[in-house]
Amino acid sequence: YLQIGNKFHINHNSKNENKLGYLNIEIENILTPLFFDNKKKLSCIVSSMNLVKLLTVENQSNENIYKIIGDFYNFLKNENWISKLIFWELELLKLVGYDLELKSIVTEEIIDDKKLYFVVSSNEKKYIPNFLVEKNNDIADFNQIFNGFKLISDYLDKSILQPNNISHPKARIEFLNTIKE
């Protein structure tokens, strides 16, 4: 029952603060086992919860993070869960202080009657998937979705992981490889 994502009700009782006391633990809601038969969703759970663990401070209460984890398990039941996941990751980054406000940093360009967004850095011009800038989570084009995940991975790497000497989480790499299949 100790699966990532299961909700528990934990009650601690002791006669006084100096005594060990006892714990009463009950499973409140089983979530992860619902997805054991889906390799992509299971990999997504491991990757996402690993990201939460990596980005949050241990033993610090954060109700907003708790709420979006609940939202995560709700949209995972939907058919278009993968496009919602990108916006969930952006919200997680925002809650931990790494807001990626794409609308304010992109430049718009029209090529062959198609609107494209890009960001220019010192050494490259990186195209941003339109649905991320326009905040349209009803996207069906898998290539755009995958490019969105790669963009978030690059942002994670350059802004959070490398400055703190943390390697890219293996669970995320495995998840990206799983959804590519």
PLM regions and their residue ranges:
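Non-catalytic alpha-helical scaffolds and adjoining flexible linkers that form interface surfaces
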Residues: 1-181
